[in-house]
Every structure is written in structure tokens, then in C-alpha cells.
Amino acid sequence: MGKKYVIGIDYGTESGRAVLVDLEGNEIADHVTPYPHGVIDEVLPESNVQLEPDWALQHPADYIEVLATAVPTVLQKSGVNPADVIGVGIDFTSCTMLPVDASGEPLCLKPEFRNRPHSWVKLWKHHAAQDEANLLNEIAAKRGEAFLPRYGGKISSEWMIAKIWQILNEDPEIYEQTDLFLEGTDWVIFKMTGNIVRNSCAAGYKSIWHKQDGYPSKEFFRALDPRLEHLTETKLRGPIVPLGTRAGVLTNEMAAMMGLLPGTAVAVGNVDAHAAVPGVGVVEPGKLVMAMGTSICHMLLGTEEKYVEGMCGVVEDGIIPGYFGYEAGQSAVGDIFAWYVEQGVPAYVKEAAEKEGISVHEWLEKRAAAYRPGETGLLALDWWNGNRSVLVDTDLTGLIVGYTLLTKPEEIYRALLEATAFGTRKIIDAFVENGVKVDELYACGGLPQKDKLLMQIYADVTNREIKIAASKQTPAVGAAMFAAVAAGKENGGYESIVEAARNMGKVREETFKPIPENVAMYEQLYQEYTKLHDYFGRGENDVMKRLKHWKETTRAAKEFMSLW
């Protein structure tokens, strides 16, 4: 048998990335395809329909564009014979969900529904279902639902049930016309294979499904809304299968589009961050993997099911078979730094960066690195896009304390970097306090590859060594590993994801170790961060929520008046 290859496709927030990998984990070729429509958060495409605050949608055709463009490109770049590609795997942002009709067609592609916002793909960071999430949590807590502690005591507005309930409340016709609500990852697998299969990772973490107990009871859904009573056996129906399972094989049509052979094995879909865990070779407890990009997803393996405040979920076999997979997260990290560069940096910084021939991020990082911990006099709360863990509250907002007339842009930038590190420390402390060990950290994604200052700050704040993924496309490599498992040993692949990870997972030789004097100062700053975190985040002062409420009601009144 000649040399064999697999392809992993990582569907991110702004683009899709395909990576062609050999069975030793060497990346042969990769290609990034930006989504033509990007993130839709203001106006629906080809219409003047305005979106409300906190909406974030996408166009499903963009996902197919990735298959049609990125896969043929990596084949062409590499010169690999399509006959030597034994499998394809994908991962996806989650919960990114869409309503489809009985033929699997997204409702937003049908002319009669094109101008209806609820017919479109709801991106993971669509936060407009917060009211539904609040009520769901209230009802679940009153009923003493067993599932609630598995999700840190709260179900997020980002997840499947809250988003479905928002559709039902705001556009019941779209709900009625929907045959199935699917995760984006499961829909793309359907397009490739013709088979509807739901992956156990997204079902477990985002749709309140449990390996032993299944979905919550009909009685629970009836308590939410009588119209939801039969949701799980109707619009959420379909087999739920473990990661690494073969979902099917490429259809003739999709094989032709992608430049591969019909019959090529396709793994069930996966969630982007979770695919990164085997991607860095982690297949045992005690190693926290941080998928760092626009947001951070924190993944950890354990040998038993523990309840941890604010975690996004604990799912048996959810990441690696044989372990309980824990997930927590921060709703904005890279997005905060990007916001500051785009909205908050004075013109002289942009001009200086241009003169030096570097990006604004690089200019700020270079100057921020000259400061010692505590030297900026600033402290921030990293809630620009709400708080995912441990407070699970999208109505919280950002905060910076300590401004003076002498505060410089690089000081603000450093304070924002530090704030996100404190947010990660808060998550680590929650795990450790509840009996889930965290001995070392692994980082992958765009940020660790380019921002050494950020990674050193994280090592100092958490007082743990950090290992960095060798790949810039770790989730895609992880997805490729699952493709190798779906292909099977008999076709040149692997028997299990553990075997695949041990042969294909790679980290860099360079690591980031805590600097003792920095650790000591950051410990003091973290105690102050914790006071602010609890004061603004646990109900002592809900000023952030009041400000957000006044903003929304004032804006709504202004828009109403403009109609007259």
C-alpha cells in the first residue's frame, strides 16, 4: 500500500481552512477560503432587512464554497493523487445551527423565506436568545432537572435549545416549516454524504443530550412551551453517533466538486475546539487545551463526571473515547484585541506602525512587552462579548479600571491581554476546586502562533507551563485524524483516535514557563480581578445590565419615532 493522506477542514468564524495531512501528521498543503458573506450582523444579504442587536448569522452557501475551493486547491498544491486520499473530516464552530426542510435545503435559500432572519444560519456568537436561555434555566432549576449541573448550572443562549425557542417565539412559521434543526457541521456532512447523522460532541455539549439519559424529558420541554413537547423526536431526530465514526462516503456529485473519488470515507462532524485536543496529541487527563482565536475554548479530560461552576459541559466520550470531556470558554479574546485596534487606537499609532512596516497589533505588543506586571496601573474585565465561563451571562459587558490622563494605548492593550489571562485563570481555578486536575496547558489557534507576550502572560497568570501546537491549523489536523479513524486500519488509517493522536499530534519544542516574580505580582492583580468579577458579575451591582437595557430601549424608541 502506497503513502496515504487525509483531509481535515476547519470551519471557523470568518473562513474555512482545508489541510492535507499524511498519516504521520505532516501537513502537505493547506488553503484558507474566506466566507464571501462573512458574519452577517447588520443587514440580511440581498435585502434591507435590519438585524437587531446581538444577532450573528451566516450564509450556508459559504460552507459549500469552502469544499469547492479549498479541497481542490490543496490537491493541486500538493500534487497528491485523489486515489491516495482515504478520508475527509470536518470541524465547525458550535453551536452554529440552521433550519432545513425535508430535503435538507436551508430555509434561507428558499425565496419565500429569504427576508426572514430566523431562516438563516445562526452563528455560535448569536446572543439574541438570552431571554429564552434565562427562562430555560429558571424552569430547569425549579424542576430540579438533573442535566443542569452538568452544564455548570446554566444553559447558554449560544446553544441549540435557546436558539430554537427564539425561532418559535419570534417566527413560528419558520419553526413550523423546519423539518430539522441541524448543527452546521452535521449539515455539511449531510451535503457530502447524503446521510443525516448527528455527532455526539455537539449533541452533548450544545443540545443537552446525555449518553446515558438522552435528551431532557418531554415534560421539561412542555414546561418550557407546549409547542416544544415533541421537539427531540421530531425536529431534533436522527441518529447520534460517536466521534471517529464513519458518517458515510462522498457522493458522486460532491466528489466531483471537491476533486476526490466517490466513496471516500467521511467522518462524522466535530466541534472546532474539541478536534484540537487530539491535534496537539492530548489523550489523557490533566492537560488543558486552549483553542485560542476570536474566543477561547478550554478542553480537559477527566476519569469521572464532576460538576464545575460555569463549565459549558461535561460529556462522556465527548472529546476522547473512554474519558469525560470537560469544556469551558471565554466569549471574546482575539475579538477584544481586534476591537481595540479597530476602534480605540489613535491615529498616531497606526501611522507609526505603518512607518515601521508592522501591524498595529505588533506595534502595541512590542511596546506593551516593555512593561512589568502591575506597571500599567490598569485592570480590566474581559466581558466585551459577555461571559461564557464561569458566569454564563451574555448581558455582562467590558470594564477597564485605572485610566489617567497619562494612560497610553500600549498600556490599555496590555491590560486587555492580562484580562483574558485572568479569565482563563478563573476557569482553571473552578476545575481544580471541583476535583478536576490541571497540571499543564496546551495552546493552539491563531493567537499562540504569533503573540509571545500573550502566552508569557498566560503562563505567569496561571503559574503553569504552556506548550504550543506545532500546527497553525490544529483543529483541521484533529479533524484529519478523525478522518483517518473513519477510513479504518484496513484502508491505511488508524483503529482509534488515541492511536491517531500518538502518531500525528505535534507540539513545538519551545514552551512558555512561568517567571516567579511575575507570578507573584499577577497573584495580587488576580485577587483584585476576582473582586471586580464577583461585584459586577454575581448580582451585587447589575449596572452593566441596566446600561445595556437602557441602550436597547432608547435605540428601539428612537427607531420607532423615525417611522413617524
UniProtKB/Swiss-Prot annotation:
Pathway(s) served: Carbohydrate degradation; L-arabinose degradation via L-ribulose; D-xylulose 5-phosphate from L-arabinose (bacterial route): step 2/3
**Which CDD domains does this entry report, sorted A to Z?**
ASKHA_NBD_FGGY_L-RBK
- Its EC number(s): 2.7.1.16
Sorted UniProt keywords: Arabinose catabolism, ATP-binding, Carbohydrate metabolism, Kinase, Nucleotide-binding, Transferase
Catalytic activity field = D-ribulose + ATP = D-ribulose 5-phosphate + ADP + H(+); L-ribulose + ATP = L-ribulose 5-phosphate + ADP + H(+)
Name the domain of life.
Answer: Bacteria
Alphabetical list of InterPro entries matching this protein: ATPase_NBD, Carb_kinase_FGGY, FGGY_C, FGGY_N, Ribulokinase
Q: Name one GO molecular function term.
A: D-ribulokinase activity
GO terms under biological process: L-arabinose catabolic process to xylulose 5-phosphate
- Check the record and name the Pfam families matching this protein: FGGY_C, FGGY_N
This protein's GO CC annotations: cytoplasm
HAMAP family found in the cross-reference section: Ribulokinase
Family of this protein: Belongs to the ribulokinase family.
Q: What is this protein called?
A: Ribulokinase
Species: Geobacillus stearothermophilus
